[in-house]
Amino acid sequence: MPLEREVERENTALSAELDGGAFLESEVFSEERLPERQYCVFRAGRERFCFSVLEVEEVVDWPIVTRIPLTPAFLMGVFNLRGTIVPLIDIAFTEGRRPGLLPKHVVVALLKADAHREDMRLGIAADEVIGTFSATEEALLDQAPADVPHCRGMLRHDDRLALVVDLRRLVDVFPVPVI
């Protein structure tokens, strides 16, 4: 107990020195701040997409992809990620990406389990991984394009809009084989 009081007294003295002797209320407690989320932003085709960095497991250079016969056009195939077979989808396939044009990176996302599914790794083809940025939930624009059902809204990033991907909807819209 005495040690805690001593630390508290030192912190109070330091606070008094920093604010000129008057105690200022902490902005954290005096002002209602919305929590910020960090997003990973990437480009697929002509569009920018993003999702929470908590869902991103890693970003890898383009791997050796094994095509699977008789699969939908959005499923580019599967690849081996340190012994785990990961399905690879192209969310920009509707933009008419030329058949010979391969993306440069794969964003590996981890979709956490719910009551009906197990944890699932999913590779998403990306032409460019732009980076990360922070935004509040309030900054989310709810006007996602109607023809992009796997997005839950848009966020402004570098004077452009990035579609916010909802991984659960993505897996519902683009069902991938469970491997």
What name fits each language-model region?
Residues 1-179:
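An acidic, low-aromatic, low-complexity terminal/linker signal
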